[in-house]
Amino acid sequence: MEWKVVDTVISPSTGVSFSCIHSLKNLRLTLWYQADVYMPPGSIIIPFNKGVLINDKLYPVTVYNVTRFNPVLWKSLKENSHCPGNCNPKPEACSYPFECLVSVCPFGLTRNIQIDNKKV
């Protein structure tokens, strides 16, 4: 089944991405998955047994949970993610003040923050 990504939120404190996806049958779900893969809004995704096709390219994805879309939960996810990349317009550098658990920034933001004398 083909799905369209409506919106995606990255959580730097957990390393989890949340995507609101919509099917042609008017079903809306929230997908919780490892943030190593970014599903940008407008992308077409198709689930496969070894991952997901995102705009016709296969990516391995670790899915943690799939739930019916809940607008109240989605609003809370957006308000509490604190990832600067989730903002519009996107900043030039990451200003997240804590260690980010996303291995590679999907927004391409660089970090100039040190925690305990270690650049994170």
From Swiss-Prot:
Keywords: Cytoplasm, Stress response
Intrachain S-S bonds: none
Listed GO biological process terms: cellular response to starvation
InterPro entries associated with the record: Anti-adapter_IraM, PmrD_sf
One cellular component (GO) term of this entry: cytoplasm
Localisation: Cytoplasm
Major localization listed first in the record, in broad terms: cytoplasm
Function: Involved in the stabilization of the sigma stress factor RpoS.
Entry's family note: Belongs to the IraM/RssC family.
Protein known as: Anti-adapter protein IraM
The gene coding this protein: iraM
